[in-house]
Amino acid sequence: MATNYNEKLLLNYVPVYVMLPLGVVNVENVFADPETLETQLKRLKEEAGVDGVMVDVWWGIIESKGPKQYDWTAYKTLFQLIARLGLKIQAIMSFHQCGGNVGDIVTIPIPQWVRDVGDNDPDIYYTNRKGTRDIEYLSIGVDNLPLFAGRTAVQLYSDYMSSFKENMADLIEAGVIVDIEVGLGPAGELRYPSYPQSQGWVFPGIGEFQCYDKYLKKDFKEAAAKAGHPEWDLPEDAGEYNDKPEETGFFKKDGTYVSEKGKFFMTWYSNKLIFHGDQILGEANKIFAGLKVNLAAKVSGIHWLYNHHSHAAELTAGYYNLFKRDGYRPIARMLSKHYGILNFTCLEMKDTDNTAEALSAPQELVQEVLSKAWKEGIEVAGENALETYGAKGYNQILLNARPNGVNPNGKPKLRMYGFTYLRLSDTVFQENNFELFKKLVRKMHADQDYCGDAAKYGHEIVPLKTSNSQLTLEDIADAAQPSGAFKWDSETDLKVDG
């Protein structure tokens, strides 16, 4: 492909990745259809000019046979195919179950030998107030308990990442694997499984707190006693999955969430999540430090009830975000300690996409989260939340990628680090869809040709630095002080249909 660049405009370039199908390596650990994938990837590379792909590397597939019995064969074959085609790889360390969330068309559980532990001790799973277990990811309560053939949950994740590094060293060394996104919760996101469709949640329900397993219960009681309130228990008045905030004692106006007890609980609940991310990213940093690779973690775009005073859906997911308390900057500060990238979602959504009763505000949410990450000095990448094929969604993605547009004289003030398109399917290649998708990639690239040298657009990957300091409660409290967002233009200056 002949290339033609304007060097200053190239500094506005946002690389585009495409997420591979969930079952590209199937549950039997077989790369089942390399021919079809190769044909599709060639078209993405040669006709659309995409920069790379993102792929889930499922724990439930790799370590399915037993503790430390890792089998990377199918993934090595897949990655070698991708490398041969000249594409880069964003690899997700997927420690969660596939199945039970939006868009999950295949089922890949966590390893059977881990689930066997859960048969005898179901408290290893996140649990709601009624006692219903969520088996898609292990509870934070067992992060440091040696319940898994002598290993803790964090050791399971750490050993897996070490094995990945050893087995993929040549591809990391060659600059093919550029990002390691560390799964930190359900759907690979740093959150609690507060809105599981498998338990009957429907949009825009408030969701439920997921901290009623015996391990987290004990942790909370100890924290409450230490704070001088041994009588405090976990919330009993926070409602059920599909309630509205005003129907609950916890989230209603002047409800429990604004009381001393409610604030204590929310601080504990959200801090557990942030320290969970901090510990596992710390392990990932130890493993990958010194290698030319980026670390990343994904934060969920919980845009519904954002305009309700309680932000109930965010609170149940573990994001303690209110009009007068910043729930996202503390996460960004935690990531900054490990030189991590914040990966966000729902970039395609507009406030008008949902009914008024959802009190949904994805545009303001994206603006808030991206701004807070940039204020903490870290990079932000992102993806669309739902399948998107139209100009309206693409133009919104382009606006978020460069909120103040292209700078003809060099690097723009605000620019996302990368965009990952969800997801590769036959529908993408339908004629009109593919033509528009090609335009999206071209506009993301600031109307420049595909550029294989990331240094030319300011993305040279340097060896990952060692985590710089211990995250403290003071760090979180400081970052939680409210601060404004950057200004966004009303629309992108590079429309796909403009």
From Swiss-Prot:
Active site: 189 (proton donor), 383 (proton acceptor)
Main localization category: cytoplasm
CC per GO annotation: secretory vesicle
SUPFAM superfamilies xref list: (Trans)glycosidases
Expression induction or repression: Circadian-regulated, with a peak in expression just before the light period in short day conditions.
PROSITE patterns per UniProt: BETA_AMYLASE_1 (PS00506), BETA_AMYLASE_2 (PS00679)
Catalyzed reactions per annotation: Hydrolysis of (1->4)-alpha-D-glucosidic linkages in polysaccharides so as to remove successive maltose units from the non-reducing ends of the chains
BP-aspect Gene Ontology terms: response to herbivore; starch catabolic process
Tissue expression: Detected in phloem sieve elements.
Deletion phenotype: Almost complete loss of beta-amylase activity in rosette leaves and inflorescences (stems).
EC number(s) reported in the record: 3.2.1.2
Residues annotated as transmembrane: none
Superkingdom in the source lineage: Eukaryota
Keyword Hydrolase assigned: yes
Entry's Gene Ontology molecular function annotations: beta-amylase activity
PANTHER family per UniProt: BETA-AMYLASE 1, CHLOROPLASTIC, BETA-AMYLASE 5
Protein name: Beta-amylase 5
Organism of this sequence: Arabidopsis thaliana (Mouse-ear cress)
